[in-house]
């Protein structure tokens, strides 16, 4: 279930979704980085996750954070689980969760390791409310309160640069952004990374991947060469290499995974 962000968080929250499942058989998915920090608050049976590149063993997570540049992840779930998934612009994640969120790296981080007892109390509160509206309101209050307490606003120039990268689907040159700000390239890259935890070139790569992944999902019959062209990759070979580097599989394998739905294109690590 999708939830529209309130006015206070509209600039920060790019997506807020609720999920509820009771599964007898395991469901496996491939999760690729989409250039945003993802906060997941969950209760019930934990989620199994394993990094694909580099290969890591399966670990159990209930509530967790993943960074904007996380490694391709396999997730597997069986049983009863309820969670809310919040996608945050990386600059906003720093405003809400503190600058430490910019250093979480490419692997998932258990939320309790980042927020301590606050994470456990949040999950317990989520388990006690019975409607989606109440659950979304609970999470929204947490985000608003955390933002007020952190008091680490991102620079307006970085927020603007992030919006431009996102609006163009990663197709704007980093040098064009620094020129429009009147900054040196080196200063812009350093400042962008300090506020988001990711360099602007990596952000653009992920935005372009998101655009390509959406096109693969929405246009199942479109030729891969056409997808590469529309997303402004140099050619299909470049598209395949870049997609594999960021998603852990080739675009054709990803498309087949979407068609199957419940089976990952990757083997279990």
Predicted features along the sequence, with ranges:
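DNA major-groove recognition helix of helix-turn-helix
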Residues: 192, 204, 242-244, 255
């Amino acid at each position: 279930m999708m939830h529209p962000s309130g006015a206070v968080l509209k600039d920060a929250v790019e997506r807020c979704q609720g999920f509820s499942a009771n599964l007898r058989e395991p469901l496996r998915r491939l999760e690729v980085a989409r250039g945003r920090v993802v906060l997941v608050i969950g209760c019930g049976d934990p989620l199994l996750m394993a990094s694909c590149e580099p290969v890591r063993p399966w670990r159990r997570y209930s509530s967790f954070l993943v960074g904007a540049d996380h490694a391709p992840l396999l997730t597997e779930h069986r049983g009863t689980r309820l969670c809310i998934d919040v996608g945050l612009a990386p600059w906003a994640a720093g405003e809400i969760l503190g600058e430490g969120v910019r250093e979480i790296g490419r692997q998932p981080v258990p939320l309790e390791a980042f927020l301590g007892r606050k994470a456990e109390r949040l999950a317990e509160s989520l388990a006690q409310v019975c409607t989606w509206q109440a659950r979304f309101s609970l999470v929204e209050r947490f985000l608003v309160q955390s933002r007020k307490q952190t008091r680490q606003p991102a620079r307006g120039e970085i927020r603007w640069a992030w919006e431009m990268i996102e609006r163009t689907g990663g197709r704007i040159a980093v040098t064009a952004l620094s020129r429009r700000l009147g900054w040196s390239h080196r200063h812009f890259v350093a400042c962008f990374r300090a506020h988001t935890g990711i360099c602007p070139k990596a952000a653009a790569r992920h935005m372009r991947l998101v655009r390509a992944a959406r096109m693969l999902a929405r246009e199942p019959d479109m030729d891969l060469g056409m997808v590469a062209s529309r997303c402004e990759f140099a050619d299909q070979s470049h598209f395949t290499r870049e997609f594999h580097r960021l998603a852990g599989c080739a675009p054709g394998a990803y498309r087949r995974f979407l068609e199957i739905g419940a089976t990952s294109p990757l083997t279990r690590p």
